[in-house]
Amino acid sequence: MIGPHWSKGWIVEDCDVSHSKCSGISLGKYLQPNNDNKWLKWKYKDGTQTERDAICQASYEGWDKEHVGSHIIRHNHIHDCGQTGIVGHLGGICSLIEDNDIHDINVRQNLAGAEIGGIKMHAAIDVTYRHNHIHHCTRGLWLDWQAQGTRVTQNLFDHNSLPNDFKVDQDNIDDVLSGLGEDIWIEVSFGPTLIDNNLFLSERSIRFAAQGVAMVHNLIAGSFTATGRGTDNNSVNLPSNRFTPYHEIHGTKVMGFMTIQHGDNKFYNNIFVQQQLRPEMQKLAEMKKDEPDDWDDYNFEVGTKPFSDYPTFAEWDKQFDGYCGIYAPNSDHYYSHLPVWSAGNVYLNGAQATAKEENPFVDTADQVKLALEKREDGLYLKTNLYDFVPEKTDGVISTATIPMAFEPEEKYENPDGTPITFDSDYFGNHRDGVKVTAGPFSSAVETEQKLF
């Protein structure tokens, strides 16, 4: 319905955008006639290869932050669209998407497959998603390829999966799975992707088909799924790695390609809460618990436990002892999982930590309640969470304390290259002192404030 068409600096503000059969707002790319749906029309190159071709061609034909992107999409009500609320491919770089209410996207399932979500963007380089409410969508936010320098901060995600009244049985399970979404899907990206001070209240929080993600000061009440999978390309007998580009720091020039090794993720000062699944979702979980596929492991257990088999930095670093170079002994260490860092996290209601996290706070005895309460002036969090969360137990996180994203060798910093100190919370209130409390709120009293 609204599209800048490969231009720069549009502002879409205070609009009601609804009932598009496809997408509400498009931040897409220009037409490349030689690449127009080439996978379908020419057939001989897989879509992942034609995607790489399109990216490289665009970088030779004017795709840079001086000419494209830097849009502002804010204070909009975007709802009841068939495919996406906001969509973008290359054309949304360096944009700010904030204070939008995005809901009821793809809930009718009249369109299915890829490119579905409240927001779906390829190459969200240096894009900031701030203080949006994304809810009641098949999927909340889908960051596909090159989420480099991307920041997701101070957002509220809820009810982004199957509808409340869904039913599942052996006859309809394939149709049901096509609508099994999550709050965020990060796919074939090397980061740095920064996710901080958000509330994830859907039953599935993050689909981790990527690496280089840092999660800091979030409330996470859903599971991590697709850990270590979802990055190959559907071959049957032969390898089909998706070679993925990474870029110059805060720019679009392609610096190299690599396969996804998984790992290189960082979890600091988050609160994990295991929610009780809806009865029908529990039934679905039981039906699929022993049937993972190449794209999803159907995990519904909350916490960092899926990363238990990943090395710590010390374990990974030890592989490189001694001589490394030509004629060194053959080794897999350049292609194995990258390390995972985890510290300062709180695990409640049976949420589980990675086996290698040192001194996590785990409370399995008490029962935390989480619910959204809709009042006349907006949404509030109804919870007893801070009856059990310890106060001021861990240090302040900053750009300097987070290891850089491995493949692009880029720090978790602002788009202008300045460092970030995570001393502001979901509401923008200051976290005082050298020790801070885990989660998106600086203190318990803030749970009484309006979320959105």
Question: What residue ranges belong to the model's regions?
Answer:
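Glycine- and acidic/polar-rich repeat regions and solenoidal domains
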Residues: 1-5, 9, 18-395
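Surface-exposed loop/turn and secondary-structure junction residues enriched for glycine/proline
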Residues: 5, 89, 122, 415, ...
